[in-house]
Amino acid sequence: MNFQSIIRGMTQNHAELNDKADDPTLRPIRSTGSPSEVADRITDWVNTQSNWQIISRDSPNESGEIALHLTRTTGLFQFVDDIHVRVVDDDNRGASRIEAESQSRVGKGDLGQNARNLRELTGAFR
């Protein structure tokens, strides 16, 4: 862990998957299947995780995109983080792109928890 990571963890409470992220584990991922199929797999995975919960899942919009609102509760202090996921069609290639962001509900810094939330989510689909 470098100095910038420490400062970031004390001053930011948000992380997002970004194509330009220095860390390749914090980039959007592609998964085979339609947005609906991929959203189903995300839902199935969340249902197997004791500290994750599905708050809402929207119906596909006109472009087929599906939005999910998830939460993850930390173990020790039971802090709740909101994770917003978008599953979008990857240009009709038989795959979908998973985009997500994680936001702490409490505090000014997350000590890297939001990035860990995103890595945990995407790690299940890499």
Spans of features found by a protein language model:
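Ser/Thr-rich, low-complexity intrinsically disordered terminal regions
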Residues: M1-R126
